[in-house]
Amino acid sequence: MANIKSAKKRAVQSEKARKHNASRRSMMRTFIKKVYAAIEAGDKAAALKAFNEMQPIVDRQAAKGLIHKNKAARHKANLTAQINKLA
């Protein structure tokens, strides 16, 4: 454990940020899983609805630096391709 006051403060702040980021990451993954579940069920309308809910959340997390912007783009591209295959 840190002895210096500023190091103790950073440890507290880092733990707080870690918990916040974990919560946001979990929420984002849940939205992504909802899209995959709709695709697996073969329901294009539900998949599109879930995708439209997921997209701004993934973009927001990428903008804030929680995930890389290329990872966000990859998720969106892969899911869009799978939804379009449902037809």
Swiss-Prot record:
Record keywords, A-Z: Ribonucleoprotein, Ribosomal protein, RNA-binding, rRNA-binding
Matches recorded under InterPro entries: Ribosomal_bS20 (IPR002583), Ribosomal_bS20_sf (IPR036510)
Protein name (record): Small ribosomal subunit protein bS20
One GO biological process term: translation
HAMAP family named in the record: Ribosomal_bS20 (MF_00500)
GO molecular function: small ribosomal subunit rRNA binding; structural constituent of ribosome
Region called Disordered, residue ranges: 1-26
Presence of the UniProt keyword Ribonucleoprotein in the record: yes
Summary of the function given for this chain in its UniProt record: Binds directly to 16S ribosomal RNA.
